[in-house]
From Swiss-Prot:
The gene is nanK. Belongs to the ROK (NagC/XylR) family. NanK subfamily. This is N-acetylmannosamine kinase. Zn(2+) binds at residues 156, 166, 168, 173. Homodimer. HAMAP family: ManNAc_kinase (MF_01234). It comes from Haemophilus influenzae (strain PittGG). One of its GO terms (molecular function) is ATP binding. Catalyzes the phosphorylation of N-acetylmannosamine (ManNAc) to ManNAc-6-P. Keywords: ATP-binding, Carbohydrate metabolism, Kinase, Metal-binding, Nucleotide-binding, Transferase, Zinc.
Length: 300
């Protein structure tokens, strides 16, 4: 079956035909930043028109929360201020094919889990450390989406009760300490301001302030991993995202994990899928979990 896969992020919308895990005819456009509701309707309509007649079903991975076909966000800033959007209904205006929706980090998790030996790893987590911090959870070989679509929003667990206010409105979330946005909130105030990419360049040159900032992020992720392992008996974790895959970051996380008792630790690896993880994961998940159900139920 041929899938039209869409990956809606805070800055871009990617689209492609996915067949047997292979990407074809990939394109990417900017996520609307002005008149975002109407802009999103128009963007989706154009993408559906571009691929008309070339797909058997639609799979969407999107930043934010997917619940009953509605897209919303814990942190609306991640979607250009878009607080709520009828995502499934918008797509359904342009196609009568089946539609399935899920969170982008959940989709990436499903893609990464396809690379695991499910008989050896039944409890798995993917963590993305990028502009924000997100993730997905597989328990007993099943991707957890939750009754409200919020399962896996691990970036909004507590890291520091006295920390900065997160974009979700809570104080001290992991995202408010470990993310690229959190790193930039500090580095932009330095005497010589810089973005997260330059922070890591300075970190690799042993700059004191940059090292402290990267270490703060890595410690928060190490503690998050320990919490996940001890609460859910996680066997393996993959870390991705622009921060998570930055040179020198994963070894720091592993270093801080070694300070904990061994029961809090598990195997950690770098995520294998790159920018197309959401597209591939969504295509696989919709086919495996929704289309292949005997009753054929499609939901999002």
């Amino acid at each position: 079956m041929r899938c039209l896969a869409l990956d809606i992020g805070g800055t871009k919308i990617a689209a492609a035909i996915v067949k047997n895990g292979e990407i074809e005819q990939r394109q990417q456009i900017h996520t609307p930043r002005e008149n975002v509701v109407e802009g999103m309707h128009q963007a989706l309509g154009k993408l559906l028109a571009d691929y008309e007649g070339q797909f058997d079903y639609v799979a969407v991975a999107s930043t934010g929360i997917i619940n009953n076909g509605i897209l919303s966000a814990l942190n609306p800033k991640n979607l250009g201020g878009l607080a709520e959007f009828p995502l499934k209904a918008s797509i359904a205006k342009h196609t009568d094919k089946p539609i399935g929706l899920l969170n982008d980090a959940q989709a990436a998790t499903y893609a990464e889990y396809q690379l695991q030996n499910s008989e050896q790893v039944s409890n798995f987590v993917f963590i993305t450390v990028s502009t924000g911090v997100g993730g997905g959870i597989v328990l007993n070989q099943i991707l957890q989406t939750g009754s409200r679509g919020i399962a896996g929003h691990i970036g909004h667990t507590l890291a520091d009760p006295n920390g900065a206010i997160c974009g979700c409105g809570r104080r001290g979330c992991v995202e408010a300490i470990a993310s690229g946005r959190a790193i930039e909130a500090v580095s932009s105030q330095w005497e010589e301001p810089c973005d997260p990419k330059e922070v890591f360049e300075r970190f690799r040159k042993n700059d004191e302030k940059a090292t402290a900032l990267v270490e703060r992020s890595a410690k928060a992720i190490a503690n998050l991993i320990a919490d996940l392992v001890i609460s859910l008996d996680i066997q393996k974790i993959a870390i991705g995202g622009s921060v998570g895959l930055a040179e020198g970051y994963l070894p720091l996380v592993e270093k801080y994990l070694q300070d904990f008792p061994s029961i809090y630790c598990c195997e950690i690896e770098s995520a294998k899928f790159g920018q197309d993880a959401g597209l591939i994961g969504a295509a696989y998940w919709v086919k495996d979990v929704l289309l292949d159900k005997p009753e054929g139920t499609i939901y999002g």
